[in-house]
Every structure is written in structure tokens, then in C-alpha cells.
Amino acid sequence: KFLDLPKYGCINVHASLLPKYRGAAPIQYAIIKGEKESGVTIMQMDIGMDTGAMLDKVVVPIEENTTMGELHYALREQGAALLLQVIDKIAAGTAVAEPQDNEQATYATLLDRSMEHIDWSKTAQEVHNLIRGFNPAPSTFTKLPNGKGLKIWGSKMTDKNSAAAAGTVIETGKHSFFVACGEGVLEITEVQPESKK
């Protein structure tokens, strides 16, 4: 009954376009899943997990190389502005609550540490999305032939193809290197050796 105590109820700012990506990690999952847009939803709170009726939304585009950190910042700015607008509507009695379509719901569950390890057998796009979605936190890594870890902070899609085994470095440049994936080749642009800053 706590949610019923405030005169105007309780509201929440959620970093996704509900009912998609209910849960704890909506920003990361939007990028990992290759979404082209995300956004912020202001909703009424109820006893469910991000299931309350929606009061307003704002859409934020996700570009090819947008990272989780960049999207987080954009959502924060847009969400703060939207929250003020919704509060004004609630105070004026003009806010309209739209129930969520539960059949369209997807979930952004807690991130698992095992997800940080790059599986090069996936497509270049999937690996690129993971790297972007985990930058700056919790980050992604791969194991070198000597057993040491290498954090991967930046990548770019390419139009290259290779018959080399997934995970093989097929080409090096002055400021990057290219890795064969299960499908396609990914350019790695920023790394951090294990135990190095």
C-alpha cells in the first residue's frame, strides 16, 4: 500500500521504450541487441517490475558506433527534461496514463560476468554490439595466446571478409587491427592490456 500513500501516486523514470527492456540493464541490452533507437519512459509505479502505466516517452536514436556511456548520457538529458514536463501535467491534472501491452514486453535481466568474454564465433555485428554495449561498464575482454587478458574498448564494422578461423588477427594497421569473426571482420580500435591503465 506504500505506493498509494502519495496524493499523486509514485512515478519512475525508466531508460527504455517500455514495454521493451523491463529490468535492470535496459541501456546495455538495447545496444547489445542492435536496436536503432532507445528512449526514456515515465511511468506510474505498481507492484510489478516496470509494469506500470506509461505517462510519456521520448525516443533517442542509437547510431552505428554509439556506446552505452554515450547513450546513458543522452537518455539522462532527455529523461530529466521529460520528467519535468510530466510532473507539470500531473499537477495540472492533464496527464494521461497508457497501460503497457504485456504481450510486447521484453526483459533486460542482470548482466552476467560471463557475457564480458568475447565469442569471436559470433558475427562481427554481434561482437561490435557487445563491445559498444559494455563500454564503459562492465567492459569486454578476450584471451591472448599467452593466456593474458585484453580488454576491448573500441571497434568498427568493416566490409572485409576472411576464411580465417574466428578470433584470428588477419591484418594490423598503425592504430588498429582486424579480427576474423564467425561472419565478417571487425576492426579493433582501442584495447587495454590486462593489469594496465
Role assignments for model-derived ranges:
Residues 109-121:
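Acyl-group handling in specialized metabolite and lipid biosynthesis
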Residues 20-22, 33-35, 90, 96-99, ...:
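A short linear-motif detector with a strong N-terminal bias
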Residues 1-107:
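Donor/substrate-binding cores of folate-linked one-carbon enzymes
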Residues 17, 69, 113-114, 189-190:
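Residues at structural and domain junctions
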Residues 121-197:
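An anion-binding loop in the catalytic cleft
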Residues 36-39, 50-51, 56, 112-114, ...:
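A generic structural signal for well-ordered coil/turn residues at beta-strand boundaries
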